[in-house]
Amino acid sequence: MTTADLLAAGHKVTVYDSLISGHAVAVPPGAELVVADVRDQEVLGHVLADHSIEAVVYYGGFIVAGESMAQPGRYFANNVGGAICLLNTMLEYDVRRFVFSSSAAVYGEPESVPLSEEAPIRPVNPYGQSKAIVEAMLRWYGSQSDLRYVSLRYFNAAGATDKLGEDHRPETHLIPIVLQVALGQRPSVPLYGSDYPTPDGACIRDYIHVSDLASAHILALRRLEEGSGVYNLGNGRGFSNREVIETARRITRRRILVKEEERRPGDPPVLVASAEKAKAELGWQPQVTSLEGIIESAWRWHRAHPEGYG
């Protein structure tokens, strides 16, 4: 979505993706796609040199917290190693503007919510730790060079547009899983943990629509002219996994069965954002602020694309 927004604003965009989890068909017309690993410094250098790149928006990295608990080495090699290669190559080719897709996972288990950017950084899984390491790296790179960066700490990205939606193989995100059950593509929704210290015993998360995340990246690119910064991106309201499932039942009018499972290691009980800093400094204002709106958009996409991107 960020790519489409940049193209609409008249920018030239090169998408660099290994396609390990991405989909070539999701790249909009007008953008060039280079299929390669970000750790391939030779290919990366050619792209930066040949395309006169002015800024990099880095969405790369593995993102499944539970998987990171089982495969920490894989996550650090890809998420941290990839960022090191990218930043070093950027500086070699005089590219000095960087927007980083970070995560609320850097906070771990917060003492209170909503979380501001000043909350302690105490990740509880290798995924969150990998994001925290890259943020620390950026502070050092920024202090020792003229690199300017913005780190955007996403809370739970969700929802879809008519053209773009979630299609992970395997799917691990709650809302797509719930909608797959509604479509009859899987028997039930696994509910990981029913004994958390929350009103209904389930994890609570702050959901933010993907189109609002995309707009934040555009604003972050503009912010780079003024300097570096770190911003939370969320709606400021938390919903439990049970509330998400019940909302999906109302929207889809389908039977959605739940199977309670043990807690997953590395899942904090509650993560809710304060995004006041992003609103004040970036001029960011989320447009899809209700859980119903987020799930309705995802439901439209999943019904129209029951096999995902194919």
Residue ranges and their predicted role:
Residues M1-A157:
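N-terminal Rossmann-like NAD(P)+-binding domain of SDR-like oxidoreductases, especially those catalyzing
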Residues I177-G310:
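C-terminal substrate-binding subdomain of Rossmann-fold SDR/epimerase-dehydratase oxidoreductases
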Residues V25-V27, E111-V113, T161-E166, C203-I204, ...:
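Short aromatic-enriched loop/helix-cap "lid" or pocket-rim segments at secondary-structure transitions
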Residues A65-M69, A160-G165, P199-G201:
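A short acidic, helix-capping loop that chelates divalent metal ions and anchors anionic groups
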Residues I121, A157-A160, Y196-P199:
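A short, flexible beta-alpha/helix-coil linker loop
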